[in-house]
Structures are given as C-alpha cells and as structure tokens.
Swiss-Prot record:
InterPro entries in UniProt: Gly-zipper_OmpA-like_dom, Gly-zipper_YMGG, UPF0757_YmgG
Superkingdom of the source species: Bacteria
Name used for this protein in its record: UPF0757 protein YmgG
Annotated organism of origin: Escherichia fergusonii (strain ATCC 35469 / DSM 13698 / CCUG 18766 / IAM 14443 / JCM 21226 / LMG 7866 / NBRC 102419 / NCTC 12128 / CDC 0568-73)
Recorded family membership: Belongs to the UPF0757 family.
Lineage: Bacteria, Pseudomonadati, Pseudomonadota, Gammaproteobacteria, Enterobacterales
Length: 114
C-alpha cells in the first residue's frame, strides 16, 4: 500500500507540474502516459519510473521536425548499444530485447535534447 501511495503521489506531482505548461510536447505526454501505465502495472515507484522513461522515449521519437529526426537517430544508436549490452550480460535474447527497449528510449530522449 505504501508503494502505491508513493507512486500515486509521484504521478500527481508529474501531472500537476505539466499542467503549468499550456502546450505539452509529445515527449511530456508520453512520459505522463507511460508513468500512468507503470502505476497500473502494480510495480510501484519502479514501474512508474520505467514507464515514464519508455513513454518519454516513444514520445520523443514521434515528435515532428528536427527534434523528431534527432530522436529517431538517437533511438537507433541507443537500441543497438542496449541490445549488445544485453547479450554481453549473458541474458541471451531476452536481455537483448530488454536492452534494446531501454537503450532505444534513452537514446531517443538524449538525441532529442542534442
């Protein structure tokens, strides 16, 4: 129960801080939606944070224009590096898939910011 309360508080803080901005980017919307899905998954704060990261990555990739192009390029590099790291840890195909997802999301966020 304590984890769910903390996670709900984190989601509320994200939601109300984003409401201060009139125009939310796709990255922000993706992070907020991903955090909500992470909360519903029942993994507490860990699920919220992972959901927000993946959601922000997906949102960054779907951005239009120059930012979206940079995010897609970053996602390709991040997914490749993440998949290689996942295989090298000895987790086989499952590690490669998890590494590609997390690496791609992180690469998209970093790529958009550059």
């Amino acid at each position: 129960m304590k984890k769910h309360t903390l996670a709900l508080g984190l989601i509320s803080a994200l939601f109300f801080s984003f409401q201060a901005h009139a125009d939310l980017s796709r990255t922000s919307k993706g992070a907020l939606l991903g955090a909500g899905v992470g909360l519903l998954s029942g993994n507490g704060v860990n699920g919220v944070l992972k959901g927000a990261a993946v959601g922000a990555g997906v949102g960054a990739v779907t951005e239009k224009g120059k930012d979206g192009k940079k995010a897609r390029k970053g996602a390709k590099v991040g997914a490749t590096l993440g998949a290689v790291a996942g295989v090298l840890t000895g987790n086989g195909l499952e590690g490669a898939i998890k590494g590609a997802v997390i690496g791609g999301a992180g690469g998209a966020i970093v790529g958009k910011m550059n």
